[in-house]
Every structure is written in C-alpha cells, then in structure tokens.
Amino acid sequence: ALWRQFVACNKKQTILNFLTENHSYASWPEKVVCYQPDNREDYQAVLKSVAVEMQRQNEDFSEIHYSVMNSYRENILEAIELLSTNSAVMDYTLRNIIGRIVIVSCDSLIATSSVLFLGLIVISPKENWTLFDYIENIIHEMSHIELYIKQLLDPLVSTGIYLKSPFRDQPRPANGVFHAAFVLSRIIFYMHNLTFSGVYKLPAAVNLNKASLLLKETLAQFDHKNCLTVQGSSMAEEMSLVLSQFQKEDSVSAII
C-alpha cells in the first residue's frame, strides 16, 4: 500500500520495483546479471535516469556500456557468499533488500541505487578491486535501499537544510547526509564482524577506522539542527551506539 501511494504521488517519473513478491527466494546467480544486448530493455530506463542524475549533480560522466566481464559477476557472487555465510541476519537482509544487481561498464560510476528503481543495484567494478571492495560496495548500496524502504514509512529528515557531506565537496541536503551516515554505520557494523586475513587485514582495519572518523564528523552535524523526525533521531542514536561500540572494541584491541 505504501509503495502504491509513493508511485501515485510521483506519476511524472519512471518508477520500477525490483523487490517482487518472490525475489527473496531467487538464487543469487539469477539475481546478479551483466548488462548485455539481450537484457537492454530491462535496464534502459534505469540507466538513463542514472546518467541524468550524474549530470544533474555536475559529476564527471562517461557513457554506460555493456559489461562482458563475467569475472566481475563471479567476484560479486563470492562477496555475497562470504557475507551470507557470516551471519543469518546478513543473509536475510541481503535476500530481502536486494532484488537484482546489474553489472555495467562505466569509468565514472562505482555503484548506485535509488527509490526510483527500488531493490536494484547498478555497479561498475574496476580491475583493481579486491574482494574487500566488492563487499564494501554491496553493503553501501544495500544500506541505501534499506533506508529508502524505511523512508516510505517516515521521512526521517526535514527538507530545506544543507549540511557537509562526508562523500562530496559541496554541501548536500540533510537527507543525503543522513543517508551517508547510515551507510557508514552499516559498513562499520557489518564489516567489523567479518574476519579478514592476509592481504585484506590491514586495508580493512584502515578503512573501518576512516569510516568511524567520517561517521563521527557526520553525526555531529545533526546535533542541535532539529532536522530529524522522532524516528530519525532514534536512528541517529543507534548509529552513535554502533560508533561507540566500534571505538570501544578498537581501543581494547589496540591495547592487547
């Protein structure tokens, strides 16, 4: 009902829902696909909206092409397998929040998702990505989708206020900054509980520490701004708890 109401209020926009009735039961090999001529019609409208949004935000833009790199698809499936087997909660979240992942080739795109194509992740892996990069980007976009769903129930953030973004040079609407904070908190929460060994151990520790610093800086901007709803404030408190727990455990491990 909430989704139908959202669609009804946005009739001028092309809106697609990839969270179908049975999407959570589909296998990951079915849900992770490469963008190719035979499925072009399925994703053309989505990729057009991605291109328009990138240009609207004055970001560097390069055309989105088909992807013939099946190795990227295998890497994504490996990352999902690692996350899914790490915990039942993660497996449930992945299956219910991600309806489809489409792999494209685009120099200026990393990954993106939107409430306008709910449940779909558009991703453009790079040759130098490690398994860690795949995991982080999947969690990143999954977190955005989770928040889009929550915002169908409650806006969480008031409009008309601009704040500093941890991922952009220019100030962004408070909603975008709230999304950034939520993504950072989810990256910390999920990845801190993963076990990285060998060549991934140090980069994982460095990236998590960087994420914690960015989250602290980002959450501080919502203090005394009065731009969050009651539910939004509650979520900000939960993010603060994730940060505090990470900092506490990180300081203990440093002593040990």
Identify the residue ranges that each predicted region occupies:
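Short, glycine/acidic-rich hinge or "gate" loops at secondary-structure transitions
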Residues: 93-95, 155-156, 197-207
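Pan-zinc metallopeptidase signature
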Residues: 205-256
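Post-HEXXH active-site segment of zinc metalloproteases
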Residues: 114, 128-136, 145-175
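Post-HExxH zinc-binding segment in Zn-dependent metallohydrolases
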Residues: 162-199
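Long, acidic, intrinsically disordered low-complexity segments
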Residues: 75-82, 86, 114-147, 242-256
